Amino acid sequence: MFENIIKNVHNRHPLIHCITNYVSINDCANIVLACGGAPIMAEDINEVSQITSICQGLDINIGMLNDNKLSSMLKAGATANELGIPVILDPVGAGSSDYRIKAVQNLMSNVQFGVIRGIKAIAAKQGIHNIAAGVYDTMQKDKSAMGVEAGIADKITDDNIKEMADFINKLSQKTGAVIAVTGGIDMVADENRVYAIRNGHKMMSLVTGAGCQLSALTSAYVAADKEHILESVCAAVSVMGISGELAYRRMAEVDGNASYRNYIIDAVYNMTDDTLKELGRIERI
């Protein structure tokens, strides 16, 4: 099911509009280039609609949010929905302030996302009957997602994997989006299927913005094959994890987390479908 996904990205060179945060913007641009896509990082409200209209994917990341950027995200998202361009949401630190909570509620109420990545603060509790309407109340009760790396995937273990698969599957059904959570065990789900992915290395937690890079990478993969979003997201998550593993193998005694970050991007650049097939640990739940 994952044949030629990486080849497709290199052949189609999707243009990805990233409205992301300044901490990781350079790495996000570079990882899109490394995988075979092309990034554009425009965020002014006077041009975002036009920029989105010429792109094949839109990546929205709320890591460094403000009113102007939020307005641009809403406008770009509306254009993408109108034109059938897949939209990725990375709600970084969504539960860390009332402002972010309301911003995510606004985005989810007005933009149809193809993929939602990193959902701790949006859906930390089961029993939400309407995600968009219920975001605020849910987040008010669970403000533990304070950092970039927080996520419910921290709680996914072999003992509860079936339960978590059911939970994430229900979130996909409620939002209409493919849901991706990353941690010790990664999970990706659409309305009918759930996959667990067991790639990655613990040193990735020392790279600020690794999750932001994954969202940008995911946007490129999905844009290259938007008819198979679930498969594209699974591949992106696995590729990022494999790249973390391969990067760690390159580490010399004098190397630190900055070298490791660069090695991850190098691994994405050199990734092939054969490498994904050989090293990807993707299983259906």
Residue ranges, per PLM feature:
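Short, small-residue-enriched loops and turns at beta-alpha junctions
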Residues: L65-N68, G93-S97, M187, M204
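Short pre-catalytic strand/loop immediately N-terminal to key active-site residues, enriched for Gly-Thr
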Residues: I197-T208
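Short, well-structured alpha-helical segments that form the helix of a local strand-helix-strand
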Residues: I168-S172, I229-G244, I264-I265
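Short, small-residue alpha-helix embedded
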Residues: K125, L206-S238
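Conserved N-terminal subdomain of the carbohydrate kinase-like
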Residues: F2-L89
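Glycine/small-residue-rich loop that forms an oxyanion/phosphate-binding "nest" at active or ligand-binding sites
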Residues: K69-G118
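Charged C-terminal helix
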Residues: I242-I285
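Conserved phosphate/ATP/ADP-binding segment of small-molecule kinases
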Residues: R100-V194
